[in-house]
Design a protein with these regions (language model features):
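PRPP-associated nucleotide enzymes
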Residues: 1-260
Length: 260
């Protein structure tokens, strides 16, 4: 198995070169673990001059020759399900996983409501909190939405009542600037000033160390993230305001499934 880390742009060429070299050796089994698919937010073109970089990055897997069939590529919390269709099906097969089970292991009844900051997060994550045996959701939900006022973008609560809860945790797949998370927290506390708000993202792809300081200044009770972006996770691993959820067990499980 090859662990592909793409949280630094300078590494992309080297990572694909190494993966291609390994595949060319025709091992008995071979798979690629790519926890972070970095161009996920550029998954579509809204204007004629937009460049869909997610599809461009995925096309690099054309360089990976099949190894006794298509090469499995494991991706954690992909931004949009349609992105798996960008990968060349004759070369690789995408296997999707999520960090939600790890996060739920951190939950207690005192965590309060699960907050979904936009429609995308609601579509991605709400189903993960549904218990089929009990035929109900495990937590109450608060849903937020983005709306524009001229050139400004605001976040407001569209479903649920923050006044009913002492605590809440915002869940999203990634953050670069923490802007949406902070605005969502502000929207909750505008309705209930006493609510304590935590946040979880699968991918903490911070664009700079200033984002870390911005998160701390915003006053989140706790900020959960995985180490799918290892360089950025290293920035906060010793900071008590953050808790890093290691993807080690998910990676091992993916490798074992690939050996079956």
């Amino acid at each position: 198995a090859f662990l592909m880390s793409l949280d630094e742009e300078v590494d992309v060429s080297r990572q694909f070169s190494a993966a291609r070299w390994m595949a060319m050796k025709k091992p008995h089994t071979f798979q690629i673990l790519m926890p972070w698919f970095p161009n996920g937010t550029m998954d579509r073109s809204d204007r004629e001059d937009d460049v869909c970089t997610a599809e461009t990055l995925a096309s690099n897997f054309l360089l990976i020759p099949p190894v006794r069939g298509t090469v499995p590529v494991w991706v954690l919390d992909i931004h949009s399900l349609q992105e798996q269709n960008y990968f060349p099906a004759n070369n690789v097969s995408v296997r999707l996983s999520t960090s939600m089970n790890m996060l739920q292991g951190e939950f207690t009844p005192e965590m309060g409501a699960v907050v979904l900051p936009d429609d995308g997060a609601e579509k991605r994550y709400k189903a993960h909190f549904y218990n089929r045996e009990a035929d109900r959701y495990l937590y109450d939900f608060i849903v937020c939405g983005k709306h524009r006022d001229g050139d400004k973008r605001h976040v407001r609560v569209t479903e649920g009542d923050p006044r009913k809860f002492e605590r809440a945790v915002i869940i999203d797949d990634l953050t670069r600037t923490a802007g949406t998370l902070i605005k969502c927290k502000e929207a909750l506390q505008a309705i209930n000033p006493n609510i304590k708000v935590s946040a979880h993202v699968a991918h903490g792809d911070f664009e700079s160390r200033e984002v870390v300081e911005r998160i701390k200044a915003a006053g989140f009770e706790r900020f959960y993230m995985t180490n799918s972006c290892p360089v950025k996770a290293g920035w906060v691993k010793d900071d008590p305001a953050f808790k890093i959820l290691s993807i080690d067990k998910l990676a091992v499980a993916a490798i074992r499934r690939g050996l079956d």
